[in-house]
Amino acid sequence: MHIPNICSIFAADLKMQCHFGHADSIMQNTEIERKFLVTSEAFIAQATESKEIIQGYLCKEPGKTVRVRIQGDKAFLTIKSSLLRKGIAKFEWEKEIDPSDAKELLQLCLPGAIIKTRYIIPTKDERQRKWEVDVFHGHKQGLVLAEIELESEDEPFERPAWLGEEVTGQPQYYNANM
């Protein structure tokens, strides 16, 4: 069975929405996050919630991905691209979808679904940001990564004691490459 290049289909659809003025807010979605290895399990005591995640990729090409994610009782379709932004900023478009549709889409994904537990740890600053710490299972068992989303690339933030080496921008730590 031939499955058309899903990245090209989504890119064409997004371009069409922009042309007809339906995607004004879509093009303004920018994600700026920093990613780190985690050196201890001390973060677990600080977590305010955790959730199980399974995700797969319909498309993984240099600079762009299309991801399906089931997170608890919710599901999302996400398009990410570094081709429209500079530095560590990425274009991100996310849409909540029906979980039963997501389960079907996961069957169409490329091999190597990611299964992980995500812990949410609030920061102690006035900006009320949060750390997302992912503990990977399955073929990436033992890998633990922490991410924080920022408003600008040079925005300062407090580094928790359990934070290790920064791996932002290192392709081997992109979920799409695992």
Locate the predicted segments by residue.
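Short, basic/polar N-terminal leader/transit segment immediately after the initiator methionine
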Residues: 4, 18, 29-32
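Short, positively charged and aromatic/hydrophobic N-terminal segments
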Residues: 5, 9, 15, 22-23
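Phosphate-end processing signature that detects enzymes handling 5′-triphosphorylated RNA
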Residues: 23-178
